[in-house]
Amino acid sequence: MWEAFDRLIDTKEGRDQFRGTLTGFKLVTLPHYHSLEPADFHAEMDDLLGDHTLRFLSIIGFRGCGKSSAGTVALPLWLALEFPDLFPFIVLIAESRDAVIELIANVRHELEENEIIQKDYGDMSDGVSKQKEWTKTSIILKNGVKILGLSRAQRIRGRRHREHRPSIVIVDDPEEIQKVDKKEYRDKTEKWIRGEVIPAIEESKARLVVLGN
């Protein structure tokens, strides 16, 4: 079966047949993220992440289950490359600035180094000043999509990219594992989500995806 699949995706036309779903996009564009046989729950997780009609989604999974690679690498790339008109402003949020920088670096690495992306979508920095627009925490693509990384300490409400407010906000591991046993810290997280994140997405009718342990 896999030999036939490999032959089918050997051309751009073949690969394009699968990119309508997040699972298909991952298989043809990010195969290096899938060295192990997927579990049954991966298909369900991808279906939920890839459902544009789900405005509020929380995915809780054990460390190493693939939720972060699906939610913070595959999902923003898929939306930015396949649905730029629907998702022109993608926001990734993590607990700390260092974590934010890592999220953006992972996305940028695929945009710059992934041979399939280069073949099928071209240089996504073409016509964009990489020195100005490709930073440690922000990327603007040639199709106009902006991927912005923010930490919990930074303001979300009122953010704009050109005429666009955030179209999807993806929050990855919003709580530090070392602090999560403290009620005060958990209360601050809930206050932040209710007081900052949810009002921000309500302003623009955006999607909210939260990934946690």
Predicted regions located by residue number:
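Short, flexible loop motifs at catalytic/binding sites
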Residues: 1-213
